[in-house]
Structures are given as structure tokens and as C-alpha cells.
Amino acid sequence: MKSKRVEKPWGHEEWLALNDKYCYKRIYINAGTRTSFQYHNFKQETNYIISGTAEVWLENDNNVIEKSIMNAGDYFDVSPPKKHRVIAITDVILQEVSTPHVDDVIRLQDDAERTDGRIESEHINPAICILAAGFGKRLENLTENINKALLPVEDKAIISHIIDLTPASFDIVVALGYSANLVKGYLKIAHPDRNFTFVDVDKIDGHGSGPGYSLRSCREHLQRPFYFITADCIVDNLPSLDTNWLGVFRTGIPELYSTVDFDEQNNIVQFSNKSSDGFEHAFIGLAAIKEYKIFWSELDKNIKSSGEVVSAFYNIKAYKDFKVQKLNWTDTGTIDNYIKIRNNKHSLAKTTGECLYRIKNKCPSCGQNTDSKCIKVFPKEISNKIKRIDYLKSFIPHVTTKDNHTLSYNWIAGDTLYAIDNVSLYKKFVEWSYNNLWKPVECKNFNELHDNFYRKKTEQRIKQYMECKILRKHVEINSVNNKYCGSIQDLLDNIDWNMLSRIPTNLFHGDLQFDNIIYNNDNDGFTMIDWRDDFGGSPDFGDVYYDLAKLYGSFLINYREMRNNNNASISIWDGNVSLNLIDHSPGLVELRDSHWFDKWIESHNFDLHTIKILTSIIFLNMSPLHELPFKDYLFYRGKEMLHDCYR
């Protein structure tokens, strides 16, 4: 059988094995609670105390109830029809092995007044409800194209951090609204072993919307003990769902949070919502709801007055007990907090919403982590990217799963060329590309594709950059590194778009830079990742010169180092922009300073002037897609380079 969790008034059981010969459980009993006083007609069991201290009642052969204090390492046998009970002095974990008569229980006295036998409601899987419907407005431009639950932290989506803490037996209910299809597609690929229920929330903005409304939308799926958590909440651990509790974190600004006061036993005694007279610990958006019927009743009574989920806790005395759990909390819901902690090692942050994740695979039989897989999510539909797999399949990873916005493949062994930073290997890859890619083909409408991709796209991207008024603190400056370059429009007017060299090919990558090339030393092979969808709207054709220009740009800027915001920046003084670039890759710097690639280009009869123009256009096109300060660096580096091409 698959392991399951069974809820109990005093804690819970984890059923690890049940067959026609035996049942194996772990039993968790909360301090201060007790099991039923009960007996069995057929079931025989042995209990071993793994941890904790308990008072064990056990009927002897003379029908006398003996009471013994037992600790970790002690055990006791129960034969039918001996009466017995366990009272937890501390939190107790028992290991029970029994005959398979799991429903054979006669309750003589039970604090929850349960009847004999199996209690069906205890056997419904508990759940966690992840509230991921909102726009994530506090994250500003980072969530313009993607749900905040999918933002990566340490190369893993925030929502995956939550799911990985959730016991395997729990159902997962996800409240969705903004960018719902992206979240669904990601979760199905990243966590195929989990049981998801997706709830579409019909109101995600304006009066009455919010976590409370989203949670109520999931109500029919939460008629059982459950956690709820906001999709921007990361914690180090998820305490057991054996009692009601709220996750809290110390704060000095109670007017911004719902805050709680509690006694020495962590019992909540008072609740305050966003008041300067509040308390020292803030509710973090994570709660365990054991008494779910009371919770829904209290939420219904109070939510109309405040519209907030915390209104269910205003009358804390309505619950049998309600505790706090002091947790190590990371709030990823604001742009400053998120940027501070994201620490993604395998991708350069973009404002497009495209995200890369590294997910541990799990063995379906043993549940242990095995190898890793790469998942990429794209807000824009990727049918062309998928179509291009047929052209590039000899050179790219084997794609294992894909849909309209997501694709996945096993993590490629090796490292990127930037990470290796070996002069000979850079050169070797350039020769490999020349020998394996860029085979010329005939394309009748290539002039149209060329114009769409270079001129029209550049005009759109420049407009997009100029409209980023919130991010750009200055108007365009026309002097770069003490050279007067003129306006960007003046520079673009210099380009004769029809005269740019071009060679149509099927075998192009489209983002051919060294952070997208994996080298495996064991098989001495290159693998290309993150290939482009199309060229000017066509997935079938590309331009050899575009790949060459991408490579040229990757010699000039180490994109891997741009993950650190301090490595590329601009400084403005007296009407001049100075470009600042830090590069810690001596191999790349050696090739750049020796102009090796310039010489290679000319020795292979390619037009170096065209490649430099296209590289400057590439930098300009990249600028609106990245965050500050790299955004501004790319724009002004492109301006300077384009100026140098025509001076």
C-alpha cells in the first residue's frame, strides 16, 4: 500500500504498511492528550516507544489495569481483549506492528466521544491549500508576465519550496487566478507524484478579493484538517498538523501585520490586526487548522467586516486550543525581499517571466532523490520552440515532457563554457559550431524574415526600453565613455538594413552564447540549451550571422557574471555615461584582448563589420528584458558599439 496519514483527536498515525499478514504504523501523540480506553476482539499488537514519555495503561491477566511510566526504548504487547490506553506526558512517537485487523477497536471511553470501529473522517487525507491567485503587485515588474508562486529561489520555484515540505500523503489544493495555466503546467511536470486540486478563483482584484476570498473558494475541498499558506511564504520546516496553530515571526512594525500575543505554553491569548498597539509576533500567512468546522464557522461570521482570512481568529476562544509556531520565515512577496534572497545559480534574471528551475527527481518505488531535471516555463506559447527540436535534436537535451508553456529535460552532466573558462575549449566550440551548424539553405522569403527580426524587432525593443520610466531614472544620454554617440534614433538611421550580410540556415541556435553551452569532459561533447523559438516568426529558418553575432557578444560580456548585479553598471556624470564591467574569467579576457574571434571570423570569410553591427543590435534588443543595472549597461554598450561601427 501507499503510505497514508490518519488523523486522530490526540495526534495522527502514519500507516507505512498494511497487507493480509500485518500492519505497520507510526503513532504520534501530542503531550497532554490520551488515546481511547479501548480493547480489541482480534487485533494483537506490539508497541515500541521511539521517543517521549508516556503513562501506559494495560490490563493484566487478573483483569487489573496496571499503570506504568515508559520512555524511549520501552515496549509493550497488547493481546485481545486486554484493555489499554496511552497518555502522553511529553510528545510521544510509537512504532506499532499488529495483525491486519485495523478496524477492530471497542472504545470504552474516548475524550472525543468517538464510536467503535473505523472513523471514516479520520481516513480522509489532510490537505494543504496554497493561495496563489493574486497578481503579486508588490513584486512590480517581476510579476508582469508570471505568477509570483513560480519565481525561482535557489533555482526552485517558491511553490515547490512549499510542496517539498508537505508530507507525501497530503492532498494539495491550489487557489489560482492570475497566470493559472502556467502554474498548472509547471506543477504537473515538477511534481507528477502529487495529488493536486486546482480551484479557479473568480475574483482576484478589487474590493472583497484576497486570501480570505481565495480560501473560501476552496472550501468544498477543505472539509478536513488542513494547512493554508500564501504563495510568497517560505519557511524552513512545516510543523505537524496535530493541533491548530499559526506561524509567527518577530516584528517591530505591528501596524503592517496581523499580530498575536501568547502565553509561556505558546497558547494564543489575543489577536490584533494591523495596529500600532499590536504585539511582537506577526502572523506569516501559514496556519494549521485541525478544527476545520469551527474555522469555517468563524470565518463566515467575521469575514464580511474585514474581508481578511485572519478574521477567523478574532474570537480565538471559539477553538479548543490555538498555539503559535515560531518559524524562520522568508517573505518573498516584496521586490526588495525577493531580490535579496533569490540566489539563482543557473539563470540570469529577466523581466520576461521566463524561469529556469532545477528539480530533484524522485524514485517512484523508494521515494529517494535521484538525478535532477531542468524545467523551463515560458509565459509566451512555445510551439515554435518545440518544433525546432526536430532540427536540433542531435545537439540539444532529450526533452522528456512539454506543453504550450513548459518543457523539461534531464539535467545535463557537465558545466557551461563560462564556468569552465578554458581558452582551448572556447576555441574548440567555435570550430565545432562551424562544422556542425550553419549549413546554408535556400529560403524564398528570407528578406521578409530578416526585416521582421532585425529592423522591426529592434524598433519595438527600443520603444519598450524607453517606456520603462519607473526603472530608468534618467532620460537618454548621448555621450558614452566620453564619446558623443548621438541619439539612439540617429544611430539606427545609419543602418542600411538591406545591406546587412545574411546566410539562411535550418541549423541555428538563436541564443548561441557560452552560458547556453554545456561541456561534458567524460564524452568530450557539447550540448546546447535554451535555443531560440524562431527567426522573424519562422521556426524553420535562421541567420548564420545572428549566431555569429551572439557568439561575438558572449566574448565581450560574460553573461554568467551578470547574475551578480554589481558586475555590470553605469555611472552618470556631467552628461556622460561611463560603462563599468567586472569580469572574473581570465580565459575569456585573454581571448577578448587578443581579438582571437575577430581574426577567426575574417579567416573564415565572414563579414566582421556586419557581425559587430548585429552584436550592437543584440545588446540594444536585450536591454528591456533585463533588470537594472544590467538593463542600462546593455543599452549604452549597444549605443557605443553601434557608434563605433559608423564613425
Describe the residue ranges of each PLM region:
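Conserved core of the sugar-phosphate nucleotidyltransferase
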Residues: 234-307
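ATP-binding glycine-rich loop module of kinase domains
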Residues: 353-388, 410-411, 418-420
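Active-site activation/catalytic loop segments of kinase-like enzymes and analogous catalytic loops
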Residues: 534-599, 616-630
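Conserved alpha/beta core of the MobA/IspD/sugar-nucleotide pyrophosphorylase nucleotidyltransferase superfamily
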Residues: 120-128, 280-360
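Conserved beta-loop-beta/alpha segment of the NTase-like Rossmann-fold superfamily
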Residues: 188-262
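Conserved kinase catalytic-core helix
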Residues: 392-396, 417-508
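N-terminal glycine-rich phosphate-binding loop and ensuing alpha1 helix
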Residues: 124-183
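Double-stranded beta-helix
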Residues: 6-7, 87-124
